[in-house]
Regions:
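Membrane-interacting alpha-helical segments
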Residues: 198-205, 209-212
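Membrane-embedded alpha-helical segments of integral membrane proteins
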Residues: 1-21
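A structural signal for short, hydrophobic/glycine-enriched beta-strand patches
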Residues: 28-30, 45-202
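Membrane-interface helix-boundary motifs at transmembrane edges
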Residues: 20-32
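Hydrophobic alpha-helical transmembrane segments
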Residues: 3-5, 29-36
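Hydrophobic membrane-insertion alpha-helices, especially the h-region
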Residues: 33-45
Length: 213
């Protein structure tokens, strides 16, 4: 993946500097590494700004809620997924007329689909099951949004969507929705502070990948 490729590039650069330990080579490769660092910092700064400014875009019309899936462990939501579900529970209680798509397929190490896990969690908390629709085929953020929108059209639900996911994930989700010509808003779930750095760095690579490919 793109994270591994970036790591290989940095490692290769360090190896070349050490191997060609002559003044000229050292100067050339030092400039290469410096240029790489400057570009990397520019990318990180831009992505950080975009993430921070797209965390919450409050709906201005009736929408369908779309909750993006995350890892399931032993048929239970992971911490990140639980954060999304708790925000969903709060938002659905505050807006009792809204319908909700729970989007997420079943990963290789998951006993049930992410959609089913989310459904069970919200129903156990008291959400009316008739308000919940399961989209259980998606394997990526793009598929989450695309397949959810297809289900929305099939069920004749409001076409504008409110995406609920963790704050670090909202910008990429909103970008994908725009590319699919789907009008979208954002309600972000809080991320535990000890998880945020890891997810944040990984998300930056995800954003770069999204714009390149």
């Amino acid at each position: 993946n793109i994270g591994n490729i970036a790591g290989m590039i940095v490692s290769l650069g360090c190896f070349l500097i050490i191997f060609f330990n002559k003044p000229l080579h050292h100067l050339i490769f030092s400039k290469i590494i410096l240029s790489f660092i400057i570009i990397l910092l520019a990318i990180i700064s831009t992505c950080s700004y975009k993430i921070l400014t797209n965390m919450n875009i409050l709906p201005q019309e009736e929408t369908t809620v779309v909750v993006l899936g995350c890892r399931v462990k032993n048929k239970k939501p992971s911490l990140a997924l639980k954060e999304r579900l708790d925000k969903t529970y709060q938002y659905l209680n505050e807006n009792p007329k809204l319908q909700c798509i729970l989007s997420g397929g079943q990963g290789a190490n998951e006993e049930i689909s992410e959609a089913k896990c989310m459904y069970q969690y919200l129903v156990s908390k008291g959400i009316d099951p008739h308000r919940l629709y399961q989209e259980d085929k998606s394997t990526s953020t793009r598929e989450n949004i695309l397949f959810s929108y297809q289900l929305i059209k099939k069920e004749n639900l409001p076409k504008a969507i409110t995406i609920i996911t963790n704050e670090f994930h909202e910008y990429r989700a909103q970008t994908i929705a725009r590319r699919l010509n789907i009008k979208s808003y954002a309600i972000s779930a809080h991320t535990a502070w000890w998880l945020f750095p890891t997810y944040f760095v990984r998300e930056i690579f995800g954003i770069v990948y999204e714009f390149i490919f």
